[in-house]
């Protein structure tokens, strides 16, 4: 059986690194730059980058409303760092005109751990990820300030939620694609398969 076809929003961020991790996790990665391509994938990854820039690019490429519709229709989506911000219902510390896709009942704080100079690495126990702790790379990372009752917190740093899941949506404040460890991607790919989206 071939793996699920997972799109990677290819407007900014670590597209190649996500593709490598998805392949290792048993998926078939494909770049997504146009709304018509959303109908051809079983799930989608929103990479990191600069969330306000990505939001503007979503409007330029006419992807914002199609992405909102896809999330509302149940498309499994995994957002890392800026991807977590885009999936949030609200953002603290962001621009008032920040375009959001939404879907996760969370409020996130941009650059919660500080600016670029305050980037750090940590080892996290992530619910649903077997084996040793996950090596997590945080770069100008957000954290979750508030989470609704339907949101499952999978990992924390200093009591702040940094990995959350709600239905078919998964988000991390860190960059799992940068470490060579595909277990977080496998968690997402497995959820795509179990949702019935995987072919």
UniProtKB/Swiss-Prot annotation:
GO terms for molecular function: glutaminase activity; pyridoxal 5'-phosphate synthase (glutamine hydrolysing) activity. It catalyses: aldehydo-D-ribose 5-phosphate + D-glyceraldehyde 3-phosphate + L-glutamine = pyridoxal 5'-phosphate + L-glutamate + phosphate + 3 H2O + H(+); L-glutamine + H2O = L-glutamate + NH4(+). Pathway: Cofactor biosynthesis; pyridoxal 5'-phosphate biosynthesis. Gene3D superfamilies: 3.40.50.880. The active site is at 81 (nucleophile), 175 (charge relay system), 177 (charge relay system). Keywords: Glutamine amidotransferase, Hydrolase, Lyase, Pyridoxal phosphate. L-glutamine binds at residues 49-51, 110, 139-140. GO terms for cellular component: cytosol; glutaminase complex. Its EC number is 4.3.3.6, 3.5.1.2. The keyword Cell membrane does not apply. Catalyzes the hydrolysis of glutamine to glutamate and ammonia as part of the biosynthesis of pyridoxal 5'-phosphate. The resulting ammonia molecule is channeled to the active site of PdxS. In the presence of PdxS, forms a dodecamer of heterodimers. Only shows activity in the heterodimer. This is Pyridoxal 5'-phosphate synthase subunit PdxT. The gene is pdxT.
């Amino acid at each position: 059986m071939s793996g699920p076809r997972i799109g990677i929003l290819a407007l900014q961020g670590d597209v190649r690194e996500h593709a490598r991790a998805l392949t290792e996790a048993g998926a078939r990665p494909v770049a997504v730059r146009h709304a018509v391509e959303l109908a051809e994938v079983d799930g989608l990854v929103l990479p990191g980058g600069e969330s306000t820039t990505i939001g503007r690019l979503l409007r330029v490429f006419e992807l914002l409303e199609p992405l909102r519709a896809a999330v509302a229709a149940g498309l499994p989506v995994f957002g890392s760092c800026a991807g977590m911000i885009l999936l949030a219902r609200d953002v603290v510390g962001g621009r008032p005109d920040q375009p959001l896709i939404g879907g996760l009942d969370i409020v996130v704080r941009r650059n919660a751990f500080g600016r670029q100079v305050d980037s750090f690495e940590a080892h996290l126990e992530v619910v649903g990820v077997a084996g040793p702790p996950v090596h997590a790379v945080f770069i100008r990372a957000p954290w979750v300030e508030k989470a609704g009752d339907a949101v499952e917190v999978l990992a924390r740093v200093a009591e702040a939620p940094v990995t959350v899941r709600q239905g078919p949506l998964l988000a991390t404040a860190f960059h799992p694609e940068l470490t060579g460890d595909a277990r977080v991607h496998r968690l997402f790919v497995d959820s795509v398969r179990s949702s019935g989206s995987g072919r």
